[in-house]
Amino acid sequence: MSSLAWKSINWPLVDSRIQRYQTRIFKASKENNIYKVRCIQKRLLNSLDAKLVAVRRVTTSNKGKTTPGVDKQVFTTDLQKEKLVRKLRLDGKALPIRRVYIDKSGISIPTVKDRAKQALCLLALEPEWEAKFETNSYGFRPGRCCHDAMEAISLSLRNHSGENHYHKYILDAGITKCFDQIDHEYLVEKLNTLPEMESQVKAWLKAGVLENFLDNNKETNTRENIMGTPQGGIISPLLGNIALHGLEDHMKEWICTKPSFAKTNRYSKNAKRKSLSVIRYADDFVLIHQDKTIIDEAKKEISHWLLNGPRLKLNEEKTSIRNSNEGFNFLGFTFITIRRGNKTRAKIYPSRKSQEILILKVRNVIQRNRSASAYNLISVLRPIIVGWANYFKYSECKKCFQKLTHLIFQQLRAWVFRRDTRNGRKEIKQRYFPSGKEYYFGGTKHKDNWVLSGKTKDKKDIIKENWLPHLTWVKGEKWVKIKGDKSPFDGDNLYWDKRTITRVNWNLRKAN
């Protein structure tokens, strides 16, 4: 490669060739043709395209591209990236990982070289396991998100047997230090992959953890990692999902062994499987069933499965059994069932805790920006407020958004009148909340006399203006759940193009 080769790479062509490899791996894995899977994976790992994509991800696309590992190396120039591509191969080695503590959790930062190797492995492993993963696993998987899990729970709560089961029981569970305590031998045995990838994954799992790196006030020390998958690695979410894969299928088989719990005593095996819903997002999951006895026994069965497999335990503080009529929280939402006549309706709202977190975050931003201009304050608050609204707009959000809009307005009004005590209130109001203006947001025109606005001049003395949209301007929508067996690697471009268009439109509305 010449020094200009990086800029002249035809990335759409490279991506399309990688996609063809991954589609073939996915389909071979679906057919349980292990020999074919391994052959295609080997070709992919050795291809120049895969190495280019892996290096691009860790040096160009990733937000952590300028964050060094223990070798203090970053790859920013085209020449450095080209050299990394030439040298990239799975050698079964891994440098110690740098541990950074955010709040109470530790994030592990591998070197850029190890990140590139992880990205290379991910290209080969992910399509194989996407063909195997269970229908209702949604965390850290391509093409799936929190809203798919939300809708799956809603569908499960709405479905009932027609035998006066107007509520269900929910096991809302979490796993204690899931990613930090997964058994290495269990994970590697379950992975069952090519020798070069197996030895490389072992090296990453066993890589030492370097504490207090770049902290001159503390002594640097390296400790051995004897269990768990380091959080922060590109491949870590996939390894976590592999370790927990099988939980849903196990519980579906388990429920079939239980005696019939219906009045008719005619529950078939298929009906029993459908009666139990297991919906997982990473290390948090819910079990839903109409019989509390089944839920009580299911909790014990899950504890047994976790202990005898990945060597994990349920987090008793995060685990509870609830009645759906009382409501429960999951992924920031509150789910509750309401009986109306002969029908059961499932309602989803932003949880009270999620609302409190938003108000606290807005308050903290305002307090940190007491002397900032309105323009700068809006620049910080807008992505927070609009991002929160776009996440929760797929629930029953209208009244919640109205309440939060009022609370945020009170904070903003206090900030405005506190910073300017020399002028009259009408003058201050007109300066920060101009009257008679129209605003376009989400393709809709809004006219409001209490919208916080700000102005600034750029380097060319051009006046720039911004404003803070109200939460209520974000309209509620219905989320369309992903089809259970679909994957971005399945080759169904028409299906994924339609979903991508929906996401693009969502992003455009978010930016407006």
Q: What kind of region is each of these model predictions?
A:
Residues 3-64, 123-139:
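Charged boundary/loop elements
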Residues 38-48, 52-104:
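Phosphate/adenylate-binding "loop-and-lid" substructures adjacent to NTP/NAD/dNTP-binding pockets
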Residues 411, 416-512:
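Extended C-terminal regions of large enzymes
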Residues 105-110, 224-228, 347, 363-376, ...:
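Short, solvent-exposed helix-loop connector elements
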Residues 87, 135-136, 148, 152, ...:
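Conserved polymerase palm-domain catalytic core
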Residues 206, 210-215, 309-374, 379, ...:
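A conserved non-catalytic segment of reverse transcriptases
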Residues 373, 377-423, 427-431:
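Non-catalytic, peripheral interaction segments enriched in hydrophobic/basic residues
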